[in-house]
Amino acid sequence: MGHLFSVPSFFDYPETKQVLWRESSIQRILNLQNTSDLILFSPENLTSDINRFYADSAEATGQSTSIRQQLESCQAVGLVANVLIDRDGQFENIPLNQQACGPDLSLFNNVDRAICVVSGSDKLDCLWGALRGKYVTDLIIDEPTARRLVESFSSH
C-alpha cells in the first residue's frame, strides 16, 4: 500500500524539516520507510521540471544564488529518492540535503530490493551515481537509454 508523503521536495530551512520530522503523523511514515523491504525510485536530473520549480521557489525567498552555488560546489548530479547525490553516489557531504525530504540513503542498505526505473538519457549522470552508490538492485530502463548507458561504460 502506498502512502502520501505530503511535504515539499526541499524545505526552505533545515529547521522546518527538523520540526516536521518530530510530528507523530510524519513519524509514522518515516517508520514505514525504515521497515520497508522494497524501494521503488527513479533518478532525477537537476534540470527536471520539479527541480526548476524548486529553484523558482528558492528565488522567491532570495535563496536561489546560494542554492545554485551549493549545487555547483558539491558537484551534485541529481537526486535519488529526493536526496542529492554526486557522481559517486555520495550524499552525506551535500549540505543542501539537510533540507531534502528524502530519507538517509543508507536506508537502501536495509532493503531486499531497490528497483530503479529510468526513462530518458538526460538521467544518465544521476543513474551512474545511483549505480556507484549501490542504490540499485533491479534496473528497469528504456532501450535508447540502455544503449547510451552501455556506450558510456568506457567513460565512467
Regions found by a protein language model. Name each.
Residues 1-156:
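Conserved phosphate- and dinucleotide-binding cores of soluble alpha/beta proteins
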